[in-house]
Amino acid sequence: MVLSPTDKSNVKAAWEKVGAHAGDYGAEALERMFLSFPTTKTYFPHFDLSHGSTQVKGHGKKVADALTNAVLHVDDMPSALSALSDLHAHKLRVDPVNFKLLRHCLLVTLACHHPAEFTPAVHASLDKFMASVSTVLTSKYR
C-alpha cells in the first residue's frame, strides 16, 4: 500500500503525539487484543497476561518500538523491519491475521487516548500505515 505525502505527514504528527506513551499504548493494545480475540493468547503461553503484567508491558514496548522504527523509516520499511519480519515468519510463525487484529486494537487505543487528533483523515492514514507495516511483516511468509 502506497502512503501519500499527506499520509506520511499525518502518521508522523500522530506518532509525535504518542511520544513517551508509546509503550503504554502498545501494552494496552495487546491487552485489548487478548480480551477481544482470545485465540491470540496462544502465541504467549509463557506470559502472565493479566492486566498490568510486566511481560505484556515489555512486549507492548517492543511493538511500539517497532512502529516507531517504521515511522522513522517510512520510506524504507522493508529494510527497517526485515529482521522483525524474519522473526515472525520463520521462528515465531505468527498467523498473519493476528497483525490485522493488533492493528485494529492499536487504532482503537490511539482513538481513545487522542480523540481530538484522531480525525477521519488521520485514522485513514494510520490504518494505511499499519497495513503497510503488516504487509512488510508478512512478506517473508511466502
Swiss-Prot record:
It holds the Pfam family Globin. SUPFAM superfamilies: Globin-like. Coiled coil: none annotated. One of its GO terms (biological process) is hydrogen peroxide catabolic process. GO terms for cellular component: blood microparticle; haptoglobin-hemoglobin complex; hemoglobin complex. The keyword Heme applies. Heme b binds at residue 88. Residues 2-142 form the Globin domain. The keyword Zinc-finger does not apply. GO terms for molecular function: haptoglobin binding; heme binding; iron ion binding; organic acid binding; oxygen binding; oxygen carrier activity; peroxidase activity. Red blood cells. InterPro entries: Globin, Globin-like_sf, Globin/Proto, Hemoglobin_a-typ, Hemoglobin_oxygen_transport, Hemoglobin_pi. O2 binds at residue 59. Keywords: Heme, Iron, Metal-binding, Oxygen transport, Transport. PROSITE patterns: GLOBIN (PS01033). Involved in oxygen transport from the lung to the various peripheral tissues. Heterotetramer of two alpha chains and two beta chains. Belongs to the globin family. This is Hemoglobin subunit alpha-B. It comes from Otolemur crassicaudatus (Brown greater galago).
